[in-house]
Amino acid sequence: MTMTLAKRFTAEVVGTFILVFFGPGAAVITLMIANGADKPNEFNIGIGALGGLGDWFAIGMAFALAIAAVIYSLGRISGAHINPAVTIALWSIGRFPGREVVPYIVAQFIGAALGSLLFLACVGPAAATVGGLGATAPFPGIGYGQAILTEAIGTFLLMLVIMGVAVDERAPPGFAGLVIGLTVGGIITTIGNITGSSLNPARTFGPYLGDSLMGINLWQYFPIYVIGPIVGAVAAAWLYNYLAKE
């Protein structure tokens, strides 16, 4: 059954909301526990500054579960892109209609904004001043080019998995949510301490918007999380398309 664009738009809003509320939300709680929620300080270096592997594993699993939940609950409605880089990559290989790219991306950004703003409303100002709303930024000492490359590599792996388990009609059914979610969790655990491991322009946009309302400005890093994920996702989609052709 073909869903209307309005229904798919709504599903992308809801799906991205779930991703950003629970994924970056887990990063916020981790930072608040580590730093003390009663000691707010201006958050200005992003979650890339988190240290322990245990912290990153916990955050990665929160993302994994949120993504799996979205894919299994909303995937049949909109495809559960919940990521502008995925939408653009699928369009670039002819697997998604061009006329729907902008509506999907708008929906994803709306969902991300709602996720961060409602998390801020639930937790209070410390979610931003201590936890930065889970915003991503390069770890101190990581250059702009290094950060873009890291995000591109991480999103390349994610998109390659998406192509193999969700887009390719030959993929065994029922595993997409689990495999994609665990892939994101693994990538976050691996590169989180370099860039915060966004892999998704919308996932970064939401926290940046919420932080801006609290006087925290990280927008100088936003191009990293647009260029890197889009380049990585498009490259993976084209490579898989080439390799999978019989």
From Swiss-Prot:
Record flagged with keyword Transmembrane: yes
Protein source organism: Archaeoglobus fulgidus (strain ATCC 49558 / DSM 4304 / JCM 9628 / NBRC 100126 / VC-16)
Keywords per UniProt: Cell membrane, Membrane, Repeat, Transmembrane, Transmembrane helix, Transport
GO molecular function, one term: channel activity
Transmembrane segments: 13-33, 57-77, 105-125, 147-167, 174-194, 218-238
A GO term from the CC aspect: plasma membrane
Protein name: Probable aquaporin AqpM
Domain notes: Aquaporins contain two tandem repeats each containing three membrane-spanning domains and a pore-forming loop with the signature motif Asn-Pro-Ala (NPA).
Family from the record: Belongs to the MIP/aquaporin (TC 1.A.8) family.
Function statement: Channel that permits osmotically driven movement of water in both directions.
Gene behind the chain: aqpM
Extracellular-side positions: 34-56, 126-146, 195-217
Predominant subcellular localization, coarse grouping: membrane
Record topological domains on the Cytoplasmic side: 1-12, 78-104, 168-173, 239-246
Sequence motif: NPA 1, positions: 83-85
Glycosyltransferase recorded as keyword: no
Membrane topology field: Multi-pass membrane protein
Span(s) of short sequence motif NPA 2: 200-202
Subcellular location: Cell membrane
